[in-house]
Every structure is written in C-alpha cells, then in structure tokens.
Amino acid sequence: MSGNKVEVDKRRTFAIISHPDAGKTTITEKVLLFGNALQKAGTVKGKKSGQHAKSDWMEMEKDRGISITTSVMQFPYHDALVNLLDTPGHEDFSEDTYRTLTAVDSCLMVIDSAKGVEQRTIKLMEVTRLRDTPIVTFMNKLDRDIRDPIELMDEVEEVLNIKCAPITWPIGCGKEFKGVYHLLRDEVILYQGGMGHTIQDSRVIKGLDNPELDDAIGSYAADIRDEMELVVGASHEFDLELFLKGELTPVYFGTALGNFGVDHILDGIVEWAPIPQPRETETRDVQPEEEKFSGFVFKIQANMDPKHRDRVAFMRVCSGRYEQGMKMHHVRLGKDVNVSDALTFMAGDRNRAEAAYPGDIIGLHNHGTIRIGDTFTQGEKLRFTGVPNFAPEMFRRIRLRDPLKQKQLLKGLVQLSEEGAVQVFRPLDSNDLIVGAVGVLQFEVVVGRLKTEYKVEAIYEAISVATARWVYCNDHKKLDEFKRKCSMNLALDGGDNLTYIAPTMVNLNLSMERYPDIEFAKTREN
C-alpha cells in the first residue's frame, strides 16, 4: 500500500450544518476536546471565565456569540485524522456555508430537539443533495425538555426526505435525562450532569435486561425496555450502503452543552463516513490516490491575523501530496508558483504545513491573485467544478463619510468580495458602489470590517434593486447592442463579470423576454 493511500484512508473531512442556535459551535468545541485539541472547552455565551469558543475567532463573532466565517480544524481521533469545517450558523452567512459544503466528504447535521427541523437546515440539506453527501444526525439539547424522539425522526424523514436509523436512544430528558441506549452495542451509557467542560467517564451498563440498570435509573429501566421494542419495530436499521449514497442517516441523541453523546458521533464518523472521494473536473474525475498534487480554493479569508493584514485562501487537497517548497501550477493564471509557507489550522492557531494529503485543508497566502474556485495542480490544466457564486438577495449602496477615502473603500470592498463575504457591483453609468448580500447582517459585518481592517468609515443605505443576474451571450454583436441599450442597469462585479442589476422583478422578466439571446444567470461558477 502506498504512503499516500495510507494517509488518504486515515482522513475524514466533514462539516457541521444546522439552524442558528441549534448548538453547532458548542459541538465543535466538544469534538475538539475529544480530539485532545483543547484542554478545556469554551462555550459560546455566558462567558463568565472569559473563555471564548475556540472556533469563533473573529472579533465580531466573539462579541455576538455566533459563527460568521468558516473555521477549519484538524485533530486525531483513534486511528483517524479528522478535518472539521465549522460553518456559519447565522442565516445571513449562507453563501460561505454552501461553498464549504463543496469541500467536505460528509456532514454532521445538528438539530435542536426542542424545535425539530428548522428552515436553515432544510436549505443546507438541499445543497448537500447536489452531491449526495452522507449525513450523520445529532439530536441536541437532551438536557432540556424536548419533543417526542419518534416524532423528531418522523419529521426528519418527511421534511428532509432521508431515512433515519437510530444508533442511540434517549432515556428521559430535561432534568430527568438519564442517558442513552446504544442499539448497536446493546449498552446503556449513563449521563452525569455538570461535566460540560471535561470528558465524562460515563458509567456503561451492558444489556437492557441487566438488573444493574434498575438499580441505576429506577422505573426508567422498564420504560426504555418497552420503548425499544416499539422503536426497533418502527425505524430503519442502519445500512452503510444507503448512508454512503446520502439516502439514510444514523441518528444520535445527546447534549453538546453537557458534553454527552459527542464521542458517540465521532466513533460513527470515523467508522462509517467516507474517506476522501474522487472529484469532478471539466475534463475528468481526479482520484485521491493519484501521485500528482491537485486542489481547489473554496474560501478566501481576509485579515485572519489583524497584525499582518493578510489574506489566506483555503484549499481542499484532492490528490497527491503537498510538500513544503513545492512548485504548483495556478491554472487560471497559467503561472507556476513556489509554495513554502502553506498553513494548517486549529481555528485561530495557524502552523506551517510540512505535508498535506487528500481531504486536508491548507491555507495559501494570497496577495490578491487567488480567487474562490481556482484550481492548483502540478502542471495539468484541470478545473474543478461545483464551487458556485449565488445571486445576492439584498442590496445596499455604500457611501463614505470621508470622500477622500474612495480608493481604500474600493480596495476593501473588492477584497471582501473576493473572500465571498459580500458581492460588490460597480454600475457602468455611475460612481455608486452597490453591495449585494444573502442577508442583512452581512452589511453590518462589511461596514464593521471596513472600519477595523481598512480604516474606512462607511455607511450603507437603501437602494431600489430587487435582484442581480450574471449576463452571458456568445454573439458579441447582440451583447454589444444589449450593453448599449441597457447600460443604466449594468454593472461589473468584483471579478469584472458583467451583471444585470434589476430594480424590480417585472423589469427583469421584461428584459429576459426582450433579449432572448442573452442568458441571465442566478449562479456563476467560480
């Protein structure tokens, strides 16, 4: 077995997806605790000890207790090496999340057991469906009062159209939460409160009929025996093949805040989740075992280190091996670059990467030449597909308090648009700068980051824009005519792509009827 194959087989690369406040960042903390990456977990809110969550490292995230950017963390667990991508839970940061889902091989879906399936989870699941990504489910917050577990699983099956196979089952909930029964191991794992910041040494009782169980949890023992007969009859058995096709999800119950059940999920991910998978390019599928290096950029993050005003491109390694000092071919630019300072991440902590294998995420220092979706190889002209840009749903005009800082404003906005935090449009017929986002909070983030990172005081104001579409046409004459007649509605985005800015949906529909040879696209491949 080649060294590369051994390394590929060790890797598990997954993202955590959920509705805001379902407990995703808390789970990330506890996962890192089990991976020995943290000595003591910090929880997101109520930080009496000043312990901020390790994965929420930007200033604004620390202030608000929400994850805004995608954090990347690598840690060992048993014999595997886990790459965990923590995605923004807040609904306004969906674009970053969508793109992150293109860089993983499986996902952990976190559900608030008191609320069930929520809107954001539905949308994220639609994105995972595009690639049939395998999903592991964690029903969180068992230390609170929850909905009926069978009802929760029925809802997941009905709303998300995926079969559920319970792996663990809760015994009680809220103040009466006693633990879980592990169906595959035939054992009860007892819950102990007040152990949220450390790893629990849980008591395990083998077998449901064990008299020790009655001594430990009293009348709950008879309840769980009766309940399990019903559950086994009413639910699906775990089937690895269906899981790998994205048709069935193993379901775990627990409490991330109480640090209970998280190790059960990790055990499942390491045992069942796929190793790094082949990746599609425009010309062929790239296999992870191939000798030559290849990878694609799915995210750019500016100013990860405020002291150095830097920008880092996050790259998923798809094949071969990254070695310090190696020469890479930047396909879009047709240039070779020597890379000696790629990074690996433990949230805000960065280390120089000596080697990286398929499934790993490395950071490349970016001086404005790397864009989201760029492919790097060892010479072959490949282009990985499926890293999309989405048309924004909300628009604002950005204005300066100090008109002399126009240059810094444009620079800041273009850099922020290149990292995918926001999209910027420069109308052909005016000096306005229009910013497009998927949610309102993004505008606040942009103004905040312009101030702290670029020393630019800007304000945003309402503008009559309903939507934007990228414009394409193979016939240059027809495109020129369209540009001439519709110039007042045309703009260039941060990458100088022609975009139609529609004041109303009626206007867009009329233009589409009037110019049938012009393509008005909702998404753009990076």
UniProtKB/Swiss-Prot annotation:
GO terms for biological process: regulation of translational termination. Transmembrane segments: none annotated. Keywords: Cytoplasm, GTP-binding, Nucleotide-binding, Protein biosynthesis. Residues 9-277 form the tr-type G domain. It is found in: Cytoplasm. It comes from the Bacteria. PROSITE patterns: G_TR_1, G_TR_2. GTP binds at residues 18-25, 86-90, 140-143. GO terms for molecular function: GTP binding; GTPase activity; guanosine tetraphosphate binding; translation release factor activity, codon nonspecific; translation release factor activity, codon specific. GO terms for cellular component: cytosol. Belongs to the TRAFAC class translation factor GTPase superfamily. Classic translation factor GTPase family. PrfC subfamily. Increases the formation of ribosomal termination complexes and stimulates activities of RF-1 and RF-2. It binds guanine nucleotides and has strong preference for UGA stop codons. It may interact directly with the ribosome. The stimulation of RF-1 and RF-2 is significantly reduced by GTP and GDP, but not by GMP. PANTHER family: PEPTIDE CHAIN RELEASE FACTOR RF3 (PTHR43556:SF2). This is Peptide chain release factor 3. It comes from Shewanella halifaxensis (strain HAW-EB4).
